[in-house]
Each structure stands twice: as C-alpha cells, then as structure tokens.
Regions:
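C-terminal helical cap/extension that packs against the catalytic core
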Residues: 45-48, 357-414
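Beta-strand->loop->alpha-helix junctions that form or flank phosphate-binding loops
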Residues: 59-60, 96-100, 232-249, 296-300, ...
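Short, basic phosphate-binding NTP loop
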Residues: 1-112, 126, 300, 308-310, ...
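Short internal beta-strands
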Residues: 30-37, 215-219, 346-347, 367-376
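Nucleotide phosphate-binding/pyrophosphate-handling subdomain across enzymes
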Residues: 2-7, 17-27, 264-368
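Short beta-strand "acidic-cap" motif of Rossmann-like dinucleotide-binding folds
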Residues: 31-35, 138-139, 160, 237, ...
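Phosphate-binding loop of NTP-binding sites
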Residues: 7, 25-26, 63-69, 76-219, ...
Length: 503
C-alpha cells in the first residue's frame, strides 16, 4: 500500500480514527474526514486535522465517497455492515480499520492478545514483565493507544497489542509473532448477531500465522483449544485444570514446563481468572526469552488495572469495589467469585444481547445478597432475576441513584460491588467514565457521612441531617419507583420484604 497514491475516507474520529488520519496525512495521502457526532470534541478534531491537510466531508457528500475514495478506514465502534461500508465493498473498494493499516506498516514484532475477558489485564501485565526484563515495549491497541502510533518502533522492540472483536472485523494482514487467545464466552451479540460470528472473529487472529510464529491458547476453553486446528503456528497451552506441556497451575503454584515460576499467593490479585491471565503471560514471556526469576518478580509486583476489581474506599465499614470493566456476564461472575464478604451488586447499563439467566443462576449460590438493577436494561435484568427466583433486588433508572441505594443497603462488613454485566453507553461514554463516576459518588458519600458526624457533635438537641435522614429521603423516592414498577411486575416477591419501607 502506497498512501500517497490513494485517497482515504476516515469514518469516525475516535482515538483510532484520529490516529489513522494523522498517519495517512503524514504519508501525503488524500484524506477525507467524517464523523456524525456533532460535538465540540469532534469539531476541534476536524479543525485540527483539516489544518494538516485533511478534507472535511458533509453528510450530503457521503454518498459520493464510495466512488471517489479508494479506501474506507472504519473506526472500531462502527460495524462492518454500516451502509457506507457496504457501499464501498459493492464498488470493490477496500474497507479497513486503523489496526489493519498499522499491520501493513509496523516494523517491530507484535504480541497480540484477544479473548472475551482479561485482555487489558494480560496486555498490561505482559508489557510490564517485558519492560522490567529490559525489553523496549509498548502496550497498545484496544487498551488505549492505537497500534498505528508505534509503526516507527525499532525492530528489536515489541508492541503488545490488545485486539478486540470489533477490530478483527476489518483486520486481515496482521501476523503477530505471538498470538494469545484467553477465552471465548458470550459477548457483543448485539453487534455480531450470533456466537458463530463472534468465534470466527476471534479465530481470525491466527489465520496468517506460519510455522515460525506461536499461538498461546487456553487449554481449558474448548472453543479456544479447537483453534489449534486452524493454524500452522506452534501451539503453547496454558491451563488451571491440567498438568500440560506449557504453563499450568497445580497445588497453589504456577509452572512452565514443570519449572515452578511462583506461587499463587505471590500474585497481588485474587481469583482463578487472574491465575489464567498470569499463566498466559508466563507462556508468552518464556517464548520471548524472559527468565523465570524476572517473570516472578514482575508478576508479584503488578498493581493491576483501573476499573477491574479495584478497591475504591471503605466507608463506615462498607468496602466499595469498582469493576466497571465487567461489561459482560462472564466477567461479572468472575468478579463475584472473588468476593469474600456478603455483597450488594450494582448491575445494569446497555444491553449487549446476553442471557442474564446464567448470571442470576450464579448469583443464587454466591456472596451476593442484594442486587440493584439500573439503566436501560434494568427490566431485562429484572425478568431474568424473577425467572431464577433471585428476589432480593431494587430497581431504578439512574446510575447515581443506584449507587446511593446500594450504599444504603450495605451493612458493616459487607461490600458494594459495581460489576454491571453491561455496556456503559446508555449513560456514559465509556466504562472508564462509569467507574470514575462510581468513585466520585463514593467519595461524596464519605464526605456527607463525615459532615453529618461533625454536625452531630456540638449539640445533641440540634435538628441535624443524619444518615438516617438521607436514607429516609432515598426511601421516599424508592417508594415512588416501586409503585411504578409494581404495576408492570405483579407482587410475586420480587421486592425484598425486609426493606419494604425503603423500596
């Protein structure tokens, strides 16, 4: 591909769209720009890229682009069956994404990581292991910084790239030195329509691998294990269930080819899913040539990532955990499994096409004692809860209100867990924004409680605002919402009778 000889339409000016446009402009390509979000941020980006030589396209001119442009660069948030993408393909024009563009130009070897859950943690962990072992490395891709920004990295360095199913829709040229597939469970069915399509996309990461490359696969996941038949690459498995030729977990220790790397007690994050992530990292790091000592040292000091089972605060004996990155059922179940105390769970957001019955079946045998259902999909969650006889729930629409309800319901020694099993896009721009809002509300609650205590100290007879007063105010609002919801759902015990006055 010679960008200077071609014209491109960049559709969508998200992080990857902006990066793709900047790269193409730096190569003297003819670049057209369009984003249908008429926000201040988009306008600033259009102005900035136009100053570099980009050409703004208005909505009326879009229909001409499939004939005018050679290539459509599609942002990951825009599906491959978007009408404009369909029109480009009908005109025998290429439809690619930023990651595909990067794959055609990047010089350094890539370690690519995909899977339904654990991608960001694994990429961050692996990048840290390599960096602390003396390698020049960049964590990139879906984790935040677009892969295209590292096309000029020297050949002796590594790009550790998180690759999502959205990116795989338009990714055809990537041939990573090591491809890691962590797991495949139900996700993004509102985008990919069915599991067959989703599985096909995950397997695409392996399609260009030769006998010179490696595929690190989860032996315990039958779908992922079967991918071994779809590639020519050398296979290295990891497992938490069986002693295999690869990375495995046995009797509280993590091994690679029968050599102990470290004990599970040395891992800073709890949960079997984190053991799986660490095993995948061990396998990939060993293939690069990192010593067992360096791997163990880096893994034991890894601090984790934001919004993934992250402790926010403890307020009046209640612990608040941010797992806003838990955007699907499997991720939420894994987060719940790590809870050591009785838990109030915050669920809800934008539906991604899940069967929530699996979730509530798991909650019935977990530490979760109450669930606050909020957001766009709250009624779908409520329906699944009823069908699974999970009756201790509260229903509301707004996220901020839901967090306060959860705080009110939690008792000393319990945990409030935000792990929504849903996308954030009904009320937020991203799961990061949702998690930050959660932390902000918790901080506000802590401040309010402290102010109430201070106000109560000088005079015992003052007409003060207490925690109980705040609870009563919330309770009055809950009563109104309960009456509204009860009209839709008959009195079958869906509301917890223990808190009748506050719901």
């Amino acid at each position: 591909m010679y960008p200077a000889n071609q014209s491109f339409l960049v559709l969508g000016l998200s992080r990857s769209g902006r990066a793709a446009a900047e790269f193409l402009l730096s190569k003297n390509a003819e670049v057209y720009l369009y984003d249908d979000m008429e926000t201040e941020r988009v306008e600033k980006e259009l102005d900035r890229l136009s100053a570099q030589g980009g050409k703004r396209v208005d909505k009326e001119a879009l229909a001409q682009m499939p004939e005018k442009c050679d290539v459509l660069v599609l942002s990951p948030g825009i599906p491959i069956d978007h009408p404009l993408a369909v029109a480009f393909r009908r005109n025998r024009r290429a439809v690619i994404g930023e990651s595909e563009l990067a794959a055609r130009f990047i010089r350094c070897p890539i370690i690519a990581v995909t899977g339904t859950n654990g991608k960001t943690t694994t990429v961050s962990m692996l990048a840290e292991v390599l960096q602390k072992s003396g390698f020049q490395v960049q964590a990139c891709g879906n984790i935040g910084t677009p892969l295209i920004e590292y096309c000029d990295m020297p050949t002796e360095s590594f790009a550790v790239a998180e690759i999502s199913s959205f990116q795989l829709e338009t990714l055809n040229s990537l041939c990573p030195h090591i491809a890691v597939i962590l797991n495949v469970t139900e996700d993004h069915l509102n985008r990919h329509y069915n599991m067959e399509n989703y599985i096909f996309l995950k397997a695409k990461l392996l399609k260009n691998l030769t006998e010179s490359e490696y595929a690190v696969l989860n032996y315990d996941d039958k779908t992922v294990r079967a991918f071994a038949e779809k590639t020519k690459a050398k296979i290295v498995y990891f497992s938490v269930r069986e002693r295999i030729k690869g990375a495995y977990y046995e009797n509280g220790n993590l091994y690679y080819l029968d050599e102990k790397i470290l004990s599970v007690a040395e891992l800073p994050s709890e949960g079997l899913h984190n053991v799986q992530n660490a095993l995948a990292v061990i396998a990939a790091a060993k293939l690069v040539g990192v010593s067992s000592k360096d791997i163990a040292k880096a893994l034991s000091s890894f601090k984790g990532i934001k919004h993934r089972i992250e402790k926010v605060a403890t307020v009046d004996g209640v612990t608040y955990i941010d797992d806003s990155k838990g955007t699907n059922v499997d991720a939420t179940i894994k987060a719940v499994e790590t809870m050591k105390t009785d838990t109030v769970l915050l669920l809800g957001g934008k539906n991604k096409g899940y069967d929530y019955g699996t979730l509530f079946a798991a909650l019935n045998v977990s530490k979760v004692k109450h669930a606050v259902l909020y957001g766009e999909n709250r009624y779908a969650l409520l329906k699944a809860a009823r069908e699974c006889s999970f009756d201790s729930v509260t229903l509301c629409d707004e996220f901020s209100f839901a967090v306060r309800i959860a705080a009110m319901r939690a008792e000393v020694g319990q945990t409030v867990l935000l792990s929504p099993a849903s996308a954030s896009f009904d009320q937020f721009a991203s799961y990061e924004e949702r998690g930050d809002k959660f932390a902000e509300i918790v901080a506000t609650l802590a401040k309010e409680k402290e102010e109430n205590r201070e106000a109560a100290e000088p005079e015992e007879d003052t007409d003060e605002t207490t925690d109980e007063g705040m609870d009563e105010s919330i309770g009055e609002q809950l009563d109104e919402r309960k009456d509204e919801t009860a009209e839709l759902f008959s009195n079958d015990g869906i509301f917890d009778s223990r808190t009748e006055e506050t719901e």
